Amino acid sequence: IVDDMISSGESMLDVARQIKERGAGRAFVCTTFGFFTDGFDKFDDYYNAGYIDRVITTNLTYLPPEALEKPYFVAADMSKFIALIIDAFNHDITIGNVLDPTDRIHSLLEKHRAGIPF
């Protein structure tokens, strides 16, 4: 379940419950900005009830320390991505390669196939 942000989380949690009730094996909630304006109680309840397996959000906004302690919470580190964008701007070059990860994916696949750690 993907959305641009989690404010209270009501809509995403409702979708998670519905898809689990319809037979989904797992439910992952993914968002760019996790604000969690109503706290984590409802997320805790849904996790404990088995409606959500993970909540994944970027570290592009402040994340309360309590979020990092949740067993279902994963912070997607965007530091390197932001650094690449800033570097591209500072050198007046296109950010196309930053936005299109195809070359990086192919490079990782080649390393994987060759048994090279990455």
Which role fits each region the language model picked out?
Residues I1-F118:
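PRPP-associated nucleotide enzymes
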